[in-house]
């Protein structure tokens, strides 16, 4: 009989088993891989890939992990099959040049049969068709009959990292759910009978460019056991979704929807499974610092959240619900990943924001798509799909998914064509790019040798003019007053790159002076943008290139300060923070980073203190060029999305910060002087921005602030230290005055409202009064409605107003006789508010609502009166 274990016990049992076999238990790597070329962690071996590829030495000979993974290539199959997921955990044991094939197979068998207690007769191993060694081990060492060992082709049982490099055969373990069907017809493709639960990869070859295989000096083992699959087997449930890893989330969603999973139809069960799977994905992604966006892994997150919301609606959930199911997921995952509980607030805030935003999109888009499908087209046109995307933010894949439910397809080619046409229109309308100059620069890059950059060590250098442009055309010479673009054979001028601005300075010749305002890079050519102040400049002229040293020093101070800022953010705010962009100028720095909430004032102060401490400690900075694999092995931070060559420049502030960076920096942190954060704000969904200053700019900033404080002291006739108390007193006085004004407004509203009693119209046994009051706030409106109903006796009162803030306010008050006739104030006023672009509700006898469009208020009130009179007569 198989062991009856929870998902958490299966995970811990696996790790403990291999720890007892000399493996070091390592924590799961982030879902955000170190390698910026990979979007998400998709396999248990990915964190060890540099070791398998020979790019990094292993710190231990044996390791075991439970690795969180996300794959979305089969997202449409999630919920449709028993075992497809976007989020899953891969339990793995790894050997780096230590044990190999025989030991890996023996331990996999021992774990399966003695620890998890799987019946041996239910386990079917597969091997690569040419791997006689593995076949013999299964037959002779383990004792599996030959006819049960399945030989498979390279497509199924041979692993490779690419067309060249380390590779090798693998052996997979399958569990047989129906052994009574016999061994004479073993078909591992029959996934209703067999489930692959453990894969053993034997990396023993290196494939060269000719496709030839040569034995590796150090042979490695890479294995993966699917946690969800093993849970299905040991817990005796029909699919992965009904294991204790996922089913509690499904039950939470079903409870919110008011349904029972077991009694639901297949379509409803599919939606519940999608919610159960995707919620685990989004919780882990946000916990690892990913925020929703329209690009890269941020878009994967956004798409998963949107699928959760939509499938929630498909099972009958009306409104927000995602944080409730996320809480169940967090409670399950925190056993192995405590960071999900630590970052609970961040996770739920991001989910709430995305859900609210998408609900608006979904309601509008589904309505329009429904209208399109009601016309019974053979296919949703590309233009219609693009209009939904462009006007309402309705994603193409969601249009495809909804259309597929009705048996329709979407014209993807037509969508792509409409998208391209819009992009072409945008490009043709964009007049800011000088295409002539750009074309000339591109031609220049094809004919001029790359510029030799000397600026890391030299601030002045001899140089020769390699090419010269004026007004987008290459010329042989240019005279005083000309705006020019100059290519030199070598230069100390830094070209704008990595967020750092280009250097300024001068080019001085025998009879010519050129002021350089900017330097850009076209391929590997440094283009110096400037103006000839004196003389004539010719191609071939020899010049002295001199950068503005004061400006460079300020830029360097700001650049090193930017590195310190990122280190401080990781230390103080969240270690998962990553750079999303930057600007390093002589007068300021700007740092964009992935984070979905404001950095608190207390954290800002702590960050400033930490950075100024590092500055005062006078850390020597170090730069070194090394292979990218070595840099990553040392822990150097890379910016996602940046493309790096085989060799990279590493800027290190020992013990503080280490980043891949091609910019210029101070030699010692003490050269920065001072650091001050000026602003912190959000600039996009999930992206925050800090603007800061360093060095002399801080003193200038403080002088300006000091002048402002002195001015305020004079105005308020208070010492600087007394200003907060003085302002607090004035605010309290203003608040008191506002309350008095509100009271007067309410009294005036009551006086005005009582003048409306004559407008009440009889409707059967009750009276109906619907009217608009000018400039009355919601509370005063509520008071007036209650007073009017009291005066009317039995009746219905609906009042509307547009207060000073410019939004619609509505109140409905119904007497018992009105309610007896089937009308409820909450539902009625909510429906009326929708006409004004809003909503609301409340009790049957008294309710409030609001709207965004004051221009629709008069029509909405007119409609309310007609409805009440018609229903109450």
Swiss-Prot record:
Cofactor note: Binds 1 zinc ion per subunit.
Reaction(s) catalysed by this chain's protein: tRNA(Ala) + L-alanine + ATP = L-alanyl-tRNA(Ala) + AMP + diphosphate
GO biological process, one term: alanyl-tRNA aminoacylation
InterPro entries linked: aa-tRNA-synth_II/BPL/LPL (IPR045864), Ala-tRNA-lgiase_IIc (IPR002318), Ala-tRNA-ligase_IIc_anticod-bd (IPR018162), Ala-tRNA-synth_IIc_core (IPR018165), Ala-tRNA-synth_IIc_N (IPR018164), Ala-tRNA_ligase (IPR050058), Ala_tRNA_ligase_euk/bac (IPR023033), DHHA1_dom (IPR003156)
Gene Ontology CC: cytosol
The protein's required cofactors: Zn(2+)
Keywords for the protein's UniProt record, in alphabetical order: Aminoacyl-tRNA synthetase, ATP-binding, Cytoplasm, Ligase, Metal-binding, Nucleotide-binding, Protein biosynthesis, RNA-binding, tRNA-binding, Zinc
Subcellular location: Cytoplasm
Domain of life assignment: Bacteria
SUPFAM superfamilies reported in the protein's UniProt record: Class II aaRS and biotin synthetases, Putative anticodon-binding domain of alanyl-tRNA synthetase (AlaRS), ThrRS/AlaRS common domain, Translation proteins
EC top class named in words: ligase
Pfam families for the chain: DHHA1, tRNA-synt_2c, tRNA_SAD
Residues given in the record as Zn(2+) binding sites: 559, 563, 661, 665
An annotated Gene Ontology molecular function: tRNA binding
Listed EC numbers: 6.1.1.7
PANTHER family, sorted: ALANINE--TRNA LIGASE, CYTOPLASMIC, ALANYL-TRNA SYNTHETASE
Function statement: Catalyzes the attachment of alanine to tRNA(Ala) in a two-step reaction: alanine is first activated by ATP to form Ala-AMP and then transferred to the acceptor end of tRNA(Ala). Also edits incorrectly charged Ser-tRNA(Ala) and Gly-tRNA(Ala) via its editing domain.
UniProt cross-references to NCBIfam families, sorted A to Z: alaS
Entry text on domains: Consists of three domains; the N-terminal catalytic domain, the editing domain and the C-terminal C-Ala domain. The editing domain removes incorrectly charged amino acids, while the C-Ala domain, along with tRNA(Ala), serves as a bridge to cooperatively bring together the editing and aminoacylation centers thus stimulating deacylation of misacylated tRNAs.
Protein name: Alanine--tRNA ligase
Species annotation: Acaryochloris marina (strain MBIC 11017)
């Amino acid at each position: 009989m198989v062991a009856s274990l929870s998902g958490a016990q299966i995970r811990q049992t696996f790790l403990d088993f291999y720890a007892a076999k000399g493996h070091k238990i390592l924590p799961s790597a982030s879902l955000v891989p170190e390698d910026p070329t990979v979007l998400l962690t998709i396999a248990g071996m990915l964190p060890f890939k540099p070791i398998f590829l020979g790019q990094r030495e292993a710190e231990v000979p044996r390791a075991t992990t439970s690795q969180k993974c996300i794959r979305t290539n089969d997202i449409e199959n999630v919920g449709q099959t028993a075992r497809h997921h976007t989020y899953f955990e891969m339990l793995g044991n790894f050997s780096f040049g230590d044990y190999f094939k025989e030991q890996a197979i023996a331990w996999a068998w021992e774990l399966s049969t003695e620890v998890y207690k799987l019946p041996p007769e239910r386990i079917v191993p597969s091997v690569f068709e040419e791997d006689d060694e593995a076949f013999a081990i299964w037959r002779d060492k383990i004792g599996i009959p030959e006819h049960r060992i399945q030989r498979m082709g390279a497509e199924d049982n041979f692993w490779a990292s690419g067309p060249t490099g380390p590779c090798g055969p693998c052996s997979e373990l399958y569990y047989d759910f129906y052994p009574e069907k016999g061994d004479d017809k073993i078909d591992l493709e029959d996934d209703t009978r067999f489930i692959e639960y453990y894969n053993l990869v034997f990396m023993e070859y290196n494939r060269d460019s000719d496709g030839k295989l040569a034995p590796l000096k150090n042979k490695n083992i890479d294995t993966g056991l699917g946690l969800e699959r093993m849970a299905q087997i040991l817990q005796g449930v029909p699919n992965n979704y009904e294991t204790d890893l996922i089913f509690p989330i499904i039950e939470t969603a079903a409870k919110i929807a008011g349904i029972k999973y077991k009694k639901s139809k297949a379509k409803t069960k599919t939606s519940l499974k999608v919610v159960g799977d995707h919620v685990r994905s989004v919780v882990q992604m946000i916990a690892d610092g990913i925020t929703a966006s329209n690009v890269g892994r941020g878009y994967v997150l956004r798409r998963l959240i949107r699928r959760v919301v939509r499938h929630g609606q498909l099972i009958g959930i009306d409104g927000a619900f995602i944080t409730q199911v996320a809480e169940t997921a967090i409670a399950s995952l925190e056993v192995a990943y405590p960071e999900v509980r630590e970052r609970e607030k961040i996770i739920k805030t991001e989910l709430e924001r995305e859900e609210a935003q998408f609900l608006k999109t979904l309601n509008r888009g589904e309505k329009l798509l429904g209208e399109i499908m009601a016309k019974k087209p053979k296919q949703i046109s590309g233009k219609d799909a693009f209009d939904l995307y462009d006007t309402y933010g309705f994603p193409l894949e969601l249009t495809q998914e909804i259309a597929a439910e009705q048996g329709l397809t979407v014209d993807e080619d037509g969508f792509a064509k409409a998208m391209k046409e819009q992009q072409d229109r945008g490009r043709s309308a964009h007049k800011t790019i000088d295409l002539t100059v750009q074309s000339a620069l591109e031609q220049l890059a094809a004919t001029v040798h790359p510029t030799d950059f000397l600026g890391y060590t030299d601030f002045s250098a001899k140089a020769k003019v390699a090419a010269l442009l004026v007004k987008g055309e290459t010329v042989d010479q240019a005279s005083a007053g000309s705006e020019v673009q100059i290519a030199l054979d070598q230069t100390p001028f830094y070209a704008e790159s990595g967020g750092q601005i280009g250097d300024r300075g001068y080019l001085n010749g025998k009879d010519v002076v050129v002021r350089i305002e900017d330097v850009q890079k076209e391929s590997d050519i440094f283009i110096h943008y400037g103006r000839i102040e004196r003389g004539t400049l010719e191609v071939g002229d020899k010049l002295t290139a001199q950068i503005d040293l004061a400006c460079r020093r300020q830029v360097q101070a700001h650049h090193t300060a930017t590195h310190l800022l990122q280190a401080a953010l990781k230390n103080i705010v969240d270690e998962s923070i990553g750079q999303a962009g930057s600007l390093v100028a002589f007068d300021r720095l700007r740092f964009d980073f992935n984070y979905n909430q404001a950095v608190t004032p207390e954290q800002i102060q702590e960050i400033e203190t930490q950075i100024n401490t590092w500055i005062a400690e006078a850390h020597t900075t170090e730069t070194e060029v090394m292979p990218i694999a070595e840099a990553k092995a040392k822990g150097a931070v890379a910016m996602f999305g940046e493309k790096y060559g085989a060799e990279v420049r590493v800027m290190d502030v020992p013990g503080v910060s280490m980043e891949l960076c091609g910019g210029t920096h101070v030699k010692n942190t003490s050269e920065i002087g001072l650091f001050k954060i000026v602003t912190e704000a959000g600039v996009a969904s999930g992206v925050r921005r800090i603007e800061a200053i360093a060095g002399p700019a801080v003193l200038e900033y403080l002088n300006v602030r000091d002048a402002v404080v002195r001015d305020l002291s004079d105005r308020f006739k208070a010492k600087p230290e007394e200003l907060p108390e003085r302002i607090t007193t004035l605010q309290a006085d203003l608040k008191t005055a506002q309350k008095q004004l509100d009271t007067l407004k309410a009294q005036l509203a009551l006086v005005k409202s009582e003048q409306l009693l004559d407008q009440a119209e009889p409707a059967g046994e009750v009276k109906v009064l619907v009217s608009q009051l000018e400039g009355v706030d919601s509370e005063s409106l509520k008071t007036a409605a209650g007073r009017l109903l009291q005066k009317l006796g039995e009746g219905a009162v609906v009042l509307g107003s547009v207060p000073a803030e410019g939004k619609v306010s509505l109140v409905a008050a119904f007497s018992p006789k009105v309610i007896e006739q089937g009308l409820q104030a909450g539902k009625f006023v909510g429906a009326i508010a929708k006409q004004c672009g809003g909503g609301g509700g409340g009790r049957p006898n008294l309710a409030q609502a609001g709207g965004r469009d004051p221009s629709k208020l008069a029509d909405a009130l007119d409609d309310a009166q007609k409805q009440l009179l018609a229903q109450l007569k």
